[in-house]
From Swiss-Prot:
GO terms for biological process: defense response to fungus; defense response to Gram-negative bacterium; defense response to Gram-positive bacterium; killing of cells of another organism. Residues 23-43 form a propeptide. Residues 1-22 form the signal peptide. It is found in: Secreted. This is Nigrocin-2ISa.
Length: 66
């Protein structure tokens, strides 16, 4: 009976550690995805701003209304 309790306690302990490690890995992966998404948003904003400025320059040059 005592060895059964020790075995169950050991399995519970190992399962708890395993669950904790899985959660840490999942959190780290979510952080990487968030960083990638933030980088993509920054790139999109940079491209949009550049295109907008270029379009504004072209319109200003063609019409002379600046």
């Amino acid at each position: 009976m005592f060895t059964l309790k020790k075995s169950m306690l050991l399995l519970f302990f190992l399962g708890t550690i395993n669950l904790s490690l899985c959660q840490e890995e999942r959190d780290a992966e979510e952080e990487r995805r968030d960083e990638d998404n933030a980088k993509m948003e920054e790139i999109k904003r940079g491209i949009f701003s550049t295109v907008f400025k270029a379009g504004k320059g072209i319109v200003c040059g063609l019409t002379g209304l600046c």
